[in-house]
Amino acid sequence: MIPDVSQALAWLEKHPQALKGIQRGLERETLRVNADGTLATTGHPEALGSALTHKWITTDFAEALLEFITPVDGDIEHMLTFMRDLHRYTARNMGDERMWPLSMPCYIAEGQDIELAQYGTSNTGRFKTLYREGLKNRYGALMQTISGVHYNFSLPMAFWQAKCGDISGADAKEKISAGYFRVIRNYYRFGWVIPYLFGASPAICSSFLQGKPTSLPFEKTECGMYYLPYATSLRLSDLGYTNKSQSNLGITFNDLYEYVAGLKQAIKTPSEEYAKIGIEKDGKRLQINSNVLQIENELYAPIRPKRVTRSGESPSDALLRGGIEYIEVRSLDINPFSPIGVDEQQVRFLDLFMVWCALADAPEMSSSELACTRVNWNRVILEGRKPGLTLGIGCETAQFPLPQVGKDLFRDLKRVAQTLDSINGGEAYQKVCDELVACFDNPDLTFSARILRSMIDTGIGGTGKAFAEAYRNLLREEPLEILREEDFVAEREASVRRQQEMEAADTEPFAVWLEKHA
């Protein structure tokens, strides 16, 4: 089932320096909660400055949904320590609140008023809040309080030059973009390995179903927790943050221009369903527009091609201008066993897997094959640890045992690990392979199995509160290592100043400005 990458691995072993200079970055979302686990109703902590313009700490959907962002980094340890400093400073500056350590929220009642993230009075800030108003009206606020970790990854120019020859200008844009689309197609075919190993949301609180019937064969505990005994990541299931209306958009990942055209079409395509919501009611705007996507960021995807945008530029226009610059992996649940929601083992695994995806052949995928890959993902998401589980390739009927496919994949990853270790020194990547491959013979070692044992004992709420309390105490006590207190104070003041400058620079009323941007 795994493509034959022996030739590509042999090539890599002859060109190990092609992997020197991998760049990566992390984003971690987490809900601010009270000591009893309920959602914090306070505004964004003052010490964290402006969520609109802060370089490292912002908010996602809700005012209580923090998002931590590391700069691009070539050093894994440095990146994780930077992320930990962001958590340490925040833990010391959020009063008696804690950071929820799980992807799925718990103590949120059906119909509870969840305050949307606020970004001030600039047109840009008001637009961001209106976008969130649209998300709330389309999918419900509860779905938007699910948290995850995003891992951003780019291969060094040395890799592309070794692979594609001496490339520059438009040629480089085309060939590098084609290379990243290969990564994306392989990710759709084999990325289910990520929720298998690291999925950590096998259960939900009963409030999450909002009284709606479900066809999933949930088991229920006395405390009202619903779980699937072999599930890995309900966050990635249809119960989590997915957009069913997007499933027939036909966006593909074969070619830069084809992909961008599909994306641009989606933000222009009217939706009958969202038209029913209306655009405005009693003088209050309800969504940016009633199209399938309000803006490009609304496209739900487990992985995205990205380029840093310039001021006023849309993500797709940035891609057209310069091609794909990096890949954003979006399938990681919060790691409940780490105070910062992600750990070194996961980052090293993702490095290995992304390199493998760049090496393995990846035939072009039609939108129908893309839909077929979802079958494998759903199996792993809902019953990934089930004995005897099999997976297919695309739309073909042949089935293969998941543990065997996983072990075959790790045989390749071990060779990538040897190459990365040879240029970085030590055996850190090989050690990760040895630790994780054991999960295929013993699913009890996976994150989902480990966290489910705790949840069955103490419920999602009890588990979440215990971890949150322990991590709060730990992070508040730890000294900063990379950033200093004065760095945070300076960024707080600078971010507030940047927001004020944006607000002062606006000349158009929001309604007029919105007509040009909706």
From Swiss-Prot:
Keyword Mitochondrion applies: no
Entry's Gene Ontology BP terms: glutathione biosynthetic process
TM region(s), chain numbering: none
Keywords: ATP-binding, Glutathione biosynthesis, Ligase, Nucleotide-binding
Pathway listed: Sulfur metabolism; glutathione biosynthesis; glutathione from L-cysteine and L-glutamate: step 1/2
Catalytic activity entry: L-cysteine + L-glutamate + ATP = gamma-L-glutamyl-L-cysteine + ADP + phosphate + H(+)
EC number(s) on file: 6.3.2.2
Record SUPFAM superfamilies: Glutamine synthetase/guanido kinase (SSF55931)
Family the entry assigns: Belongs to the glutamate--cysteine ligase type 1 family. Type 1 subfamily.
Protein name: Glutamate--cysteine ligase
Lineage summary: Bacteria, Pseudomonadati, Pseudomonadota, Gammaproteobacteria, Enterobacterales
